[in-house]
Amino acid sequence: MAEEKETKKKRRNRRDEILQSLAQMLESSDGSQRITTAKLAATVGVSEAALYRHFPSKTKMFDSLIEFIEDSLVSRINLILKDEKETIARIRLILILILGFAEKNPGLSRILTGHALMFEQDRLQGRINQLYERIEVQLRQVIKERKIREGSAFLHDEALLASQLLAFCEGMLARFVRTEFRYHPTQEFEARWPLIQAQLQ
């Protein structure tokens, strides 16, 4: 029993090591090209066969990274909605969360922008699209609830405002990737925030 637990632990550690290596490769210059299993195996220091003992395909590796992104963002958005009741503060915190997560995880930002998925299965891009749609729905709900919570609605349609807020985040992430991570998504956020807030009328 103890041996079985130890084997599972080692297997989990190796899986994590493979995923961390893939994320690091996405952050490096390799991330702008197609990452092959041969390159990944060399980075991890194992054979390609060893990779496939932990993941049946490279697609499954990307699936695991996307799952981490989903869990990280969605769980933290839920915490924001639980702890913060004021609408504008909620929106601000959600934007900072998305931008900050990408900034702390440059390799994963290539997945969020779709750049790392250009050479992979379309299904993976579909998962990212669904994540953005889910976040947009949450933003729309936050905006819609303002009338109930605070007694006054926004002048503009909640769907329009939610898509505008998400488009801002996507644009900052795209800039981050395009500049090879030189311009951080949270850079000058405090200066930009009044411009964003001016749209929330």
Curated annotation (Swiss-Prot):
Gene Ontology process terms (BP) = cell division; negative regulation of division septum assembly
One Pfam family in the UniProt entry:
TetR_N
DNA-binding region positions on the chain: 36-55
Judging by the UniProt lineage, the source's domain of life is Bacteria
Example GO CC term: the record gives: cytoplasm
The family annotation for this protein states:
Belongs to the nucleoid occlusion factor SlmA family.
Under the heading PANTHER family, the entry gives: ACREF/ENVCD OPERON REPRESSOR-RELATED (PTHR43479), ACREF_ENVCD OPERON REPRESSOR-RELATED (PTHR43479:SF11)
Q: How does it assemble?
A: Homodimer. Interacts with FtsZ.
Give the protein's recorded name.
Answer: Nucleoid occlusion factor SlmA
- Organism of provenance: Proteus mirabilis (strain HI4320)
